[in-house]
From Swiss-Prot:
Protein name: Large ribosomal subunit protein bL31B
Gene3D superfamilies: Ribosomal protein L31 (4.10.830.30)
Keywords, in A-Z order: Ribonucleoprotein, Ribosomal protein
Species the sequence originates in: Polynucleobacter asymbioticus (strain DSM 18221 / CIP 109841 / QLW-P1DMWA-1) (Polynucleobacter necessarius subsp. asymbioticus)
GO biological process: translation
Amino acid sequence: MKPGIHPEYREIVFVDVSNNFSFKTRSTMSTRETIKWEDGNEYPLAKIETSSESHPFYTGTQKIMDTAGRVEKFRQKFGTKAVAKASGDGAAKTAEKKAAAAEAKAAEKPAKKKA
């Protein structure tokens, strides 16, 4: 291996912020925060939203995990616009054009009388 091109592989503590579960492992992740671990040493700290202690697959529980508000962001961005386009001005204008065309066609053709 070439020296100086690889990231530092060191011990780091991960903390699940949803339930304060923490574990120490090795990683190349860089972080500015540190934490004092059970053995008295200080290690870099990485905060995560989900771990095996809080993920529904491993816990067997159902819970909504929309901590970042992704659904609301999506609805704000696309929800109201998509509904407005589908049932709004475009559909109304098309219906008006079709009705006007049908009326014009009916006015052009003279009514036939039965003799």
